[in-house]
């Protein structure tokens, strides 16, 4: 479930809901989890659908890249994305969770061809800040980010366990994103939420229940960066897809972009022709 809002009018803010998670922490659990060795992740990877028609990919891209499921200030049907390097900083005293998050960021960077994303050494150097909190501190953290009144509205309408929001400029370029994740709900859910929230903070903010293969479906849990969503993010971050584009403008360039994206996703995942 996703909420998009303008508050104040110059601020584009979207709040995404997902079932979130985190763990109790054994020394090498972060390495194991990020390597896809959790049984819940491994079983999903074995059963994953990896072959899609052009129309299946395009449908999912258009549904997730435009608009948002829940709005406070109307619909905005324009492409929103970062137009430069993305640097992520994690604020937490949980070294295991920070290690997992860094591996998630590295995985995203490996699989999205034209996205320059990496961890930052400080909050000041980051344009994506990830706050890792205990579940009992979530509402207080939301209040510190968005104010008590907005936090109550979020809790009443969405009852989130994790969320993210971004600020864009007048050209629909994302300037800054905030992600809030809880750390004490289990490994699988932590990774599931970390992937979805980080990816949605990059632009594809619309959850949809009509596309069964995407993690941007509230009925789907992944825990890893699946092939279908790699198509969506690679389409979004192709240089020919520009911030501020309308649906019609995107459709005009999609065929050529999709040809190149298919070749990249096939290569990086070692998929058969």
Where are these regions (language model features)?
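Bacterial N-terminal signal peptides
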Residues: 14-25
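Metalloprotease/metallohydrolase-associated module, dominated by Zn2+-dependent proteases
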Residues: 44, 72, 151-189, 205-273
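Short hydrophobic beta-strand segments
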Residues: 83-95
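Metzincin-family zinc-dependent endopeptidase catalytic domain
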Residues: 99-195, 200-211
């Amino acid at each position: 479930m996703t909420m998009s809002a303008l508050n104040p009018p110059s601020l584009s803010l979207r709040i995404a809901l997902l079932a979130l998670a985190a763990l109790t922490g054994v020394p090498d659990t972060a390495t194991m989890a990020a390597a896809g060795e959790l049984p819940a992740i491994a079983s999903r990877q074995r059963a994953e659908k990896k072959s899609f028609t052009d129309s299946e990919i395009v449908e999912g891209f258009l549904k997730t890249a435009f608009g948002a499921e829940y709005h406070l200030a109307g619909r905005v049907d324009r492409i929103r994305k970062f137009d430069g390097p993305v640097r992520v900083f994690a604020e937490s005293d949980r070294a295991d969770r920070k290690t997992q998050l860094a591996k998630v960021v590295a995985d995203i960077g490996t699989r999205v061809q034209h996205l320059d994303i990496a961890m930052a050494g400080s909050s000041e150097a980051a344009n994506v800040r990830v706050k890792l909190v205990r579940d009992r501190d979530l509402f207080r953290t939301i209040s510190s980010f968005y104010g008590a009144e907005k936090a109550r509205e979020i809790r009443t309408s969405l009852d989130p366990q994790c969320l993210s929001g971004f600020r864009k400029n007048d050209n629909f370029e994302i300037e800054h994103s905030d992600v809030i994740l809880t750390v004490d709900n289990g490994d699988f859910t932590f990774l599931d939420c970390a992937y979805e929230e980080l990816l949605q903070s990059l632009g594809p903010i619309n959850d949809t229940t009509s596309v069964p293969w995407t993690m941007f479906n509230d009925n789907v849990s992944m825990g890893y960066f699946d092939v279908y969503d790699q198509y969506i993010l690679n389409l979004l971050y192709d240089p020919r897809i520009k911030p501020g584009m309308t649906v019609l403008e995107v459709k005009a360039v999609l065929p050529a972009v999709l040809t190149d994206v298919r070749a990249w996703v096939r290569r990086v995942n070692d998929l058969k022709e």
